């Protein structure tokens, strides 16, 4: 669990670092650049695992790498370009509930009544947050929607990724998935980039290195290492930590303005996700086969 908490602390700062990187280059190019930086780190390690991967594991490895790095990162960081870092971090707070609902519909992990209640409350919180953006704070509906879509993809592949990591090992999966994703990302970064101009700055360069080394490689390495020891549902519940730190950093580091209405919506979303974590621990377990729990 320690590895995943540390990775969430790193990821919570990724949107803040990305805002600095956007002053230097386009969002799609930024995603490509951070993956390329990660490749230089993992490339020496990749060689030792290439011949050890069974042939029947390459197809799921390629698909999960494409979804986890290319699709998720493109959706979230292009969406971030249109909305504030604080609102983006708040929307990321929906991840635990998305994890539960996706598990309910696709993986037979039944959601309880309080999950549905928390999900409805969190959705209302997002609506309030976006509505409050009209009073200031640069909160954009389409930007938030793209980030939610990226989160939905991430939560959908958590269980298959966990199974693949159990077969290959976290070091092999992390290094190889980063390497192949950098190649698969190239046509999409060129297609989706609105500008190919690069305006060098120290703040943008340092932010890009941080995104490539810490957020792309080290953060995923920690997360994948922790996934081999932590159930998928618990992994989803740990994600409630990310928006809390992210919102605080957005206000302190970026000096982002949050209107009263948007702040209320953010609090509702974070509180709903937190309630989804706490309620299973405090409520009595449902009786099985007619017997008392």
Language model features with spans:
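Specific transmembrane alpha-helical segments of multi-pass solute transporters/efflux pumps
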Residues: 10, 14-15, 43-92, 128, ...
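Hydrophobic/small/kink-forming positions within alpha-helical transmembrane segments
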Residues: 9-12, 16, 65-70, 74, ...
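Hydrophobic/aromatic residues within transmembrane alpha-helices
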Residues: 21, 30, 34, 79, ...
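Hydrophobic alpha-helical transmembrane segments of multi-pass integral membrane proteins
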Residues: 2-3, 29-44, 63, 114-124, ...
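Helix-helix packing/entry segments at the starts of transmembrane helices
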Residues: 31-33, 73, 88-94, 160-183, ...
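Glycine-/small-residue-enriched transmembrane alpha-helix faces in small-molecule transporters
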Residues: 1-29, 136-163, 183, 288-293
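Hydrophobic transmembrane alpha-helices of multi-pass small-molecule transport proteins
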Residues: 42, 102, 111-133, 151, ...
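Specific alpha-helical transmembrane segments that line the substrate/conduction pathway
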Residues: 29-40, 77-110, 115, 150, ...
